[in-house]
Amino acid sequence: MTSKQYSVKLTSDFDNPRWIGRHKHMFNFLDVNHNGKISLDEMVYKASDIVINNLGATPEQAKRHKDAVEAFFGGAGMKYGVETDWPAYIEGWKKLATDELEKYAKNEPTLIRIWGDALFDIVDKDQNGAITLDEWKAYTKAAGIIQSSEDCEETFRVCDIDESGQLDVDEMTRQHLGFWYTMDPACEKLYGGAVP
């Protein structure tokens, strides 16, 4: 991950209205019961149970993925049985992003990479170490966040840093880190028009 093509903007932009809007959009998307609060229970249900069950993960893959989701959102301060409102959620994201960027700068494993490894293992159906556009489309359909084929293809294009026509976990980690943590311009349109 030290290659120049995988370098990422390492400074946060927490006051950027677009960064805040991006996270507010996801907060609302992940608020399964629409009560204005979310909990780790909802995150695991949405990010793990629904998605992974729709992708045919093995029990081992499902457990690994669930553990990664728990650790990731736990890093943002979320807990089972505890509802988090928007102000606490965004503050948790700031802490998570700061911690993750420090790890990334030191070439240490990040929670987003650990989650990416777990998800990649499930999405990469032929286990060749790369995700094809068809595999990506199957995942985005199961996740429900990207609805249009155009947005799915745009996401794939943005993540395909080396322009190989396939995605590897390093590319995915780099682009998601830049999109969710720092507003890196190279990551714009990561979700097409599905996420601001």
From Swiss-Prot:
Q: Which InterPro entries match?
A: EF-hand-dom_pair, EF_Hand_1_Ca_BS, EF_hand_dom
Annotated Ca(2+) 3 binding sites: 160, 162, 164, 166, 171
Where Ca(2+) 2 binds, per the record, is at 124, 126, 128, 135
Q: Is this entry keyworded Endoplasmic reticulum?
A: no
Domain of life of the organism in this record? Eukaryota
**What keywords are assigned to this protein?**
Calcium, Disulfide bond, Luminescence, Metal-binding, Photoprotein, Repeat
Record's keyword annotation contains Repeat: yes
**Which residue ranges does the record assign to the EF-hand domain?**
18-53, 54-108, 117-146, 147-182
Question: Which residue stretches, if any, does this entry annotate as coiled coil?
Answer: none
Q: Name one GO molecular function term.
A: calcium ion binding
As for family, the record states: Belongs to the aequorin family.
Its function? Ca(2+)-dependent bioluminescence photoprotein. Displays an emission peak at 470 nm (blue light). Trace amounts of calcium ion trigger the intramolecular oxidation of the chromophore, coelenterazine into coelenteramide and CO(2) with the concomitant emission of light.
| Record's protein name | Aequorin-2
